[in-house]
A protein has these predicted regions:
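Secondary-structure-rich domain cores
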Residues: 84, 108-109
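Solvent-exposed helix-loop boundary motif
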Residues: 2-92
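Short, solvent-exposed alpha-helical surface patches in well-structured domains
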Residues: 71, 100-103
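Short, well-ordered beta-strand segments
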Residues: 12, 102-108
Length: 111
């Protein structure tokens, strides 16, 4: 499988948000809804996202086949620790899209 890079991951996340906006007929207010601690304009911003004190991509899980343990992948697949599956109320990312994000994290989050 070809190595995944940041532009593809950003596209997956942006497309998912666009589908959410269309389905829910409103803007998601990400900064308000997540205590101002989530974003993905850059891969660094995504890596540093820490909504409600939960690091989305813990650095010790990058590049070592532990992406499935990250809060990002866990919350995209289903609810965790009292937090509902994201994006809230769907539509959710497709399983193959989540798998691509996990592969990217496992590959060390290449640019």
């Amino acid at each position: 499988m070809a190595e995944l890079h940041w532009p593809r991951i950003k596209q997956i996340l942006d497309d998912g948000m666009e589908r959410w906006k269309q389905a829910n007929n409103r803007n998601p207010a990400m900064k308000v809804a997540h205590d101002g601690q989530i974003g993905w304009e850059t891969k660094e911003e995504l890596a540093e996202s820490n909504p409600y004190g939960k690091q989305l991509i813990e650095s010790d899980k990058v590049g070592n086949d532990r992406a499935e343990e990250t809060n990002l992948i866990r919350i995209l697949r289903g609810p965790i620790g009292g937090f509902r599956r994201m994006p809230s109320r769907g539509p959710y990312l497709a399983p193959n899209e989540i798998s691509e994000i996990a592969q990217w994290i496992n590959a060390g989050m290449p640019d």
